[in-house]
């Protein structure tokens, strides 16, 4: 994900450094709550993600949405920087590069879709002894809900951000 994001920044930086900086800021704001939730839910591997729903269903849904936002799926926040970059490339008459970037972003989308599929649609074989993880109350930082909302639903603020 970060490697793909660096590619987007490298392409747009010579044309518009402001868009590149906005891209990294949005990416950081999306990554922080994602990693924070993964740490709280003790998720390290794809195998851990198959049983994430047993720890906290709500946190699992939020993590799934944040993964989709990181992938750049519209209408989530992660789509905004890609849209701005593609727009800048087209305005600079670099349509072939914009097309190539858009097509290559499908690889990143595939990775995140596979991860969200594993998290939401599959269950590993279980025995009655290990059917459910212990449900300890997860204590989240008070800032986490705000960060989650910011990482998912900032696209309506895009016109205001780009005019600054």
Predicted regions and their residues:
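Core, highly hydrophobic multi-pass alpha-helical transmembrane subunits of bioenergetic inner membranes
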Residues: 1-164
């Amino acid at each position: 994900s970060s490697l793909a994001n660096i590619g987007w920044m490298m392409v747009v930086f010579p044309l518009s450094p402001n868009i590149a900086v906005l891209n990294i800021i949005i990416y950081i704001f999306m990554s922080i709550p994602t990693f924070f939730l993964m740490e709280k839910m003790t998720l390290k591997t794809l195998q851990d993600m198959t049983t994430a729903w047993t720890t906290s269903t709500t946190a699992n849904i939020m993590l799934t949405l944040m993964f989709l936002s990181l992938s750049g799926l519209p209408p989530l926040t992660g789509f905004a920087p890609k849209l701005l970059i593609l727009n800048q490339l087209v305005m600079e008459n670099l349509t072939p590069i914009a097309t190539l970037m858009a097509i290559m972003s499908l690889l990143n989308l595939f990775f995140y879709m596979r991860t969200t599929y594993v998290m939401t649609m599959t269950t590993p074989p279980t025995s009655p002894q290990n059917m459910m993880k212990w449900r300890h109350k997860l204590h989240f930082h008070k800032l986490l809900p705000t960060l989650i909302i910011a990482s998912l639903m900032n696209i309506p603020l895009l016109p205001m951000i780009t005019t600054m």
